[in-house]
Amino acid sequence: MDWTTETPNTEPSLVTATPSTTESLVDPAKMKVGYFGNEFPHDDLHDLSRRLYNWSKDRQHTLLATFINEATAAVRQEVRLLPATLRTLIPPFETIFSLVSHADLRHGPLGGCIDGMLLCAVQLATFIGYYEDSTEDTFHWHNADACLAGLGTGLLSTVAVSVSPTLADMPVTGAEVVRMAFRLGILVHEVSRILQAPTSDGGPGDSWAYVVPDAVADDVQSELDAFHDAKKTPESSKVFISALSRTSVTISGPPTRLKDLFLVSDYFRDRRFVPLPVYGGLCHASHVYTKEHVDSIVNTESSSLVSLDSRLAPRVPIFATSNGKPYSAKTVSGLFRNIVEELLTQRIEWDNVIEGVIQHAKCTAVSEALVLTFRTSLPARDLVEALNSESLPFKGRTQDLVPWVTKPQAEPRGPRGAQQAKIAIVGMSCRLPGGADDTGKFWEILNQGLDVHKKVPADRFDVETHCDPSGERLNTSLTPYGCFIDEPGLFDAPFFNMSPREAVQTDPMQRLAIVTAYEALERAGYVANRTASTKLHRIGTFYGQASDDYREVNTAQEIGTYFITGGCRAFGPGRINYFFKFSGPSYSIDTACSSGLATIHVACNSLWNGDTDMAVAGGMNVLTNSDAFAGLSKGHFLSKTPNACKTWDCEADGYCRADGVATVIMKRLEDAEADNDNILGVILAAGTNHSANAVSITHPHAGHQADLTREILSKAAIDPLDVSYVEMHGTGTQAGDAQEIQSVVDVFAPLSSTKRRATKQPLYIGAVKANVGHGEAVAGSTALLKVLLMLQKKTIPPHVGIKNAINPGFPKDLDKRNLHIAYHRGNTSIVLEEGPVRSIQDSDKDTRPMHVVAVSAKSKVSLKGNLQRLIHYLEANPDVSLTHLGYTTTARRHHHNHRIAVSTSAVPHLVRQLNSHLQSADTHKPIPSTGAPPVVFVFTGQGAAHRSMNLELFRDSPCFRSQMLYLDSLCQSQGFPSIIPAVDGSYPQDHTHPPTVTQLALVCIELALVAYWESLGVRPEVVVGHSLGEYAALHVAGVLSAADTIYLVGQRARMLERKCQIGSHKMLAVRAALDEVQSKANGKPFEVACLNGPKDTVLSGTVSEMEALAEELEQSGLKCYHLDVAFAFHSAQTDPILQELEETAQTGVLFQPPRLPIISPLLAKVIFDEKTVNAKYICRATRETVNFVAAVEKALAMSTVDETMVWIEIGPHPVCVGFVRSIMSTVNMTVPSFRRGENNWQTLSQSLAAVHAAGVEVDWNEFHRPFEHGLRLLDIPTYAWNNKTYWHQYNGDWALTKGNNFYDSKKKSAAAGSPLAAAPVSSLRTSLVHRVIEESFSGTAGKVIVQSDMMQADFLAAAWGHQMNGAGVVTSSIHADIAWTLGKYLLDSLKPNSRKSVVDMEISNLVVREGLVAQKNRSVPQLIQVSISTADVDSGVAYLEWHNVTNDGVSLADQEPIVTAQIRYGTAGDYLSSWVPALHLVQGRIEALSQLADDGIANRLSNSMAYLLFADRLVDYADRYRGMQSVVLHGLEAFADVKTKPDDEGGVWTVPPFFIDSVCHLAGFVMNVSDAIDTKNNFCVTPGWGSLRMARPLVAGGRYRSYVKMIPTAEDPTVYLGDVYVLEGDEIIGVMQGMKFRRYPRVLLNRFFTPADIKNPASGSMSCAKGARSSAQSTKSPANVAESVPTPAPAPVPAPEPVPVQRNKQDTAAPPVAASDSTAAKALDLVAAEAAIELSDLQDDVSFASLGVDSLMSLVIAEKLRQQLGITVSGSLFLEYPTVRDLRVWLDEYYS
């Protein structure tokens, strides 16, 4: 809506001032005038609004963003209140500026309303942003000299400025202005359409206002009156004067009345007039609008106005456009009323406004009036001209506020928040058709314009039998063509901790997804937790997948353990998260063909929402199922011709299916820049919608596609004409291509008169499907990779889809329509641009002379491959920067156990070193799997360094420098001189500093070096200091603070300076043992200062004594040299200071307990306690001998240090590490920190390379941090996989023949004759039996099947009442209750008149093959199924089986039951009679045990003690299970007094399990508590019993006595048998006969009894045995572990044939024989020891099964391999590697 009242101005402004040169507006001599006109700035409104929105994303423009959000919310609220007829005219909008692009809306009935609202929004957004952006001009609008003026709707904008005391108030007040403008526009529209009906075409109609130049108002009014009288015009329809100026009159009225006026009026007919662009309706009409109209707009009771009135008020005067006087309102709502009334009812007289401004300027006595405008306009020019009148004492000038919007951003300030961020793509990888195993090969296909289609390969299916072009054969494809990945089965399973079996059963697309994820992460320079954006919990995975071919066809032929985890889609991204330990979200997304790009959109949203900081995203598709080919062919989706997609071809007849796996790594742009990543491309916006209005679900819709594109361009604040390339979906279908090209040209290449592409703005389009086919779920990701490669190569590859002529359905005017890169896909689209260009400043360049290049791998094969790849890269790029290469291979790579590191200064040297390592790669040893080697810090004493140093580390390393400066400040604060001149190169090397400076400098260097090493992640486990270096060692060990260390060293040095003469004594180093020195000294005097090594001795004495001694010793052939020290330490020269030194240490220093072991050269021992180091120690260490040799030898003897440790010398030159090597000849490694005369960085590089290769984890990122601005991540070769083929081939043609009704008809006939079909479902339910799912009864035969959920409260409580290893375990007493329940139910159903109860039923032959452990997650069910059946109940026998059930209720009844038992029907009387003969024997043994207890021979235990011991050994029972009141135990025999406890929890039981357990678990107590069993190293569990009968019911509170004696069996000494007798008074009422227990090594307890849902799969675990049962519910244990019930152990599972694994052709060499110290040799030693065989029996061709290695022994050996060798495998190890050769080869390859 616009109420313009003057001719549109086309002249430039007269006087302008740019914002950058504006003087301070607080100057009282200057007046500010804010002018808000009634027309948009002359800039392109689309561009202006887009720029404002873009600026709102900037972190500096938070108020601008707030205003846009508040104004948008206000308008949305108003839209919701509109009547439906108007509400439907306004489309959904993301922000108010989104409405700018809706041309139909702005030119439609509500055009005036929308434009009026947009005018206020643009003005206020520009105004707010101007003040946020300006560094010179500030928001001071409440001085007495400021004033405001406006025209039309712009007058409303002045309210926000007038009432806002600060800029921060303007977003809210501005939003209210926008709300008022919208309401005003709606009112004017509604009133005006009553005066004149809208046009039938819905367009804007004609103008409601004409300007008549050179007219006189009185004459105009007279003519109007005459016209109205003649026409008898109704009052409301009269034409009237709406505005006056000195040069013109503006008349307004209904458009038809205006036209009529100019046709019939003599006065107007011949006059010049100008129709104004006022199409929204009538304003300034007092005869039309009333007070009620004003009230409808300004509702003073609305919450928003009430809030504003309560805290704000008008402050800056606004001049009324009618009389030029300031509005007098005192409230915000009052001011709005004044202005709305002005706009609706008052005439505009601009000259009055000008006069009002002039009078205001005169009153404030200003010298200058500055008019702030939004570009130039006639009213503003008239105002400035008037202000510049010669008669006035001031001058006027304008200042345009718009230029800040259109200026380029001076420097990147970053987005306001995550939602405004751009998304950087920092890594990518792929496996695509045509041999494109990397992005380089993919680009070759694109650049050469190749079409890589081919016939379906044989490894997918037989194309001859599964393809029929005629379409006559059932279930066949019409086309034999596709685009396929070469060898999709190749995979490095051990690298990803997968067994061969798991790899074969895992979908190859999921395998390739994790491979490309690793490669993409590697190319992105990802290192876990290196930066804030790489924290593991902030990384998520997002993959598109639209099919499960491999699971449906390949692995479905032989369903195994990993059928679900290896085949279901959700496990693909989940596996990536699991392997990399990402704990962010993992999504598998299926949106058909847009899956790959929809996934990118979801990943972007995750980054924008702040849910993640890094996203691993992509798509995957590997085609193996002929069904999809057949179905797509039948649906007319696929092309029948030999080609990839014929995109845009006139004969396009469908698409060509394709494989593909692609991964990209994404971060927010500012994070990528902060992380120093390579930015391959930047995503500005992304969106997804659906073609809801398409003619079918598979048909695209141009309108929806165009809507989506406009939406994301709006989000990105990008002009469509700035887009130069569009990558299209381009499937090669007639309808799809035509619809898509239409949506593209509509948005990116319009032909409108106001917006079209210039000649220099060509638009290019392309579609990658023409090269590599349609990858379906990976199609979008593939196209994204293409565009990223185009950005890298700065080339648009040729399009090869048009084989004949262009699609005739395309627009005919493409040439006339002459994309920032835009990337557009179906109904998911993203906008891409190139990444920021980064340059390296001279000040950022890396000055280090030497660099570390690291190579690592998980296997020897890959190590060789990685070395070869890097060598080839260097040969191809000889000018590569070693700076960047070192940074890339160290800080930006993950490091594996096979490590090589080279410190180098030139590429040729590096190549030679790498070739040398390549030659020796076969004998290379990996770092220990037990972890990084421990580190010893050894601190140098005096005499090793130059007198003055120039430390490069002090110059370059902020860490080292800050530490040195901090320590220097401590020195000076304690009154010592500065040490910095001794280290910063201020003096020449031979300059001698005072001893205080020299000694303090040495110690401070060492302290700073420790801080530096620790910043690299290298920390000591032991410390030792030599002489003065011991002070630094004491600090690092925590004994002395840094301040106390400096205090002691400085005070000691000052004492020496004060009390000892410099140069009077010397220290002499001799290359000989002390004995040899003494024998060759010929009696010359000396003192022994240091014993450094077996042949390194330092002597002290006076100068003359040392010179004479040196001469004598050198004549004897010994090498001697004088140390460059001021004093002879550890000699009589130091005696004068000793007492004072001890007193100083006693009073001035606080000694703390050591945190680390300290090797003491003074005491020749290792210090651990807090008392040894004290003031006396400090004194003695100064005077007495440094016995470094004895100290290290003592530490070695105590195992404080050993040969595996890494020794790092902390000091200015390596001295002590030489001593260490002479003492420990086999020491692993010794390295220096600095070396005299060598650049610090060179020394450190060499040392870091060595310790890294030895296994010490170095924080390389920290090492490179000082130079990171000058470092770049190189795109070097990715990991060389040790690939083998893992592939389950689809066999036969069952995919074709399955399409019949044979099985359906068979199932129907079987169901019709089955007694189960009509059987009713019973209401039977107890605490342990929950649901009868089937039952059938026929004569004396019957069957009942029930299911129970272990997670139900009663069942769960029963299981958790019997805890083992911290887990709830289903005791056999639970099985007994279930058996008796079903036994009675079956009998009652078949024999309703039977009077038998459970006391008449025997549970026999209970065999528990798998223990049931309650899972931890109680939110999902844990189901079991139990069946009971009998062919003839009169036979007295029924059979029971227990099976696992999947969570969705699918029974595993086709597998071996986990528990079996029988019910035998008898009579209680017979049972009781049969036990009478045994009664006296049992009672006799009970009396004998009681007597033994009285004699102190047997143990009598109370209830609490018994169960305390039971819990300590194995089972922790809940209170209601604890029925044994006392126990008498002797050897393997015991009796117990039992009292059963009531069920306070109200369960429904047949025989409560805690009753059964209470009277029977005495046997388990004996087996796990008795001292006759080695319970420390073993535990015993029962696999079942022979018979359980209870001839009397067990009752709550009943008192019973149990007796048992266990005996080992003759066949197997690990198996024990016994009978448990239950007595009530003098009667045996129950017997558990043949209760069996088996002994197991305690090391297996955790393996057997851990809930399945919290077991951690081993990192290198092997798969289960072929055919082995897989159940989430059961623990693969030898038996149920209830102590009250026994079972035979399962037989060993026969070893299967190994999974066929095809090696690469080059990988055919036989493995080397295992060295005696290799991991393989140690593992075989362990196997031999455990199997009790000779090592010589383990020949290569021997199978482990033949040696008696059964399933149990496998579990024991697996556990010991983990504990002793750090190798984690599953118990199926010997099934995967059945022979000695198989195992040795595997261990040699991956663990040697």
UniProtKB/Swiss-Prot annotation:
PROSITE patterns given in the database record: CARRIER, KS3_1, KS3_2, PKS_MFAS_DH
Domain Ketosynthase family 3 (KS3), first and last residues per copy: 420-834
Catalytic residues as annotated in Swiss-Prot or TrEMBL: C593 (for beta-ketoacyl synthase activity), H729 (for beta-ketoacyl synthase activity), H774 (for beta-ketoacyl synthase activity), H1362 (proton acceptor), D1557 (proton donor)
Annotated positions of the O-(pantetheine 4'-phosphoryl)serine modification: S1751
Top enzyme category: transferase
Listed pathway(s): Secondary metabolite biosynthesis
Start and end residues of each stretch annotated as N-terminal acylcarrier protein transacylase domain (SAT): 44-284
Any one Gene Ontology BP term: fatty acid biosynthetic process
Function: Atrochrysone carboxylic acid synthase; part of the gene cluster that mediates the biosynthesis of the tetrahydroxanthone dimer neosartorin, which exhibits antibacterial activity. The two different monomeric units appear to be synthesized by the same set of enzymes, among which the Baeyer-Villiger monooxygenase nsrF is the key enzyme for the divergence of the biosynthetic routes. The pathway begins with the synthesis of atrochrysone thioester by the polyketide synthase nsrB.
NCBIfam families associated with the record: PT_fungal_PKS
Protein name: Atrochrysone carboxylic acid synthase nsrB
Naturally occurring in which organism (per UniProt): Aspergillus novofumigatus (strain IBT 16806)
Gene: nsrB
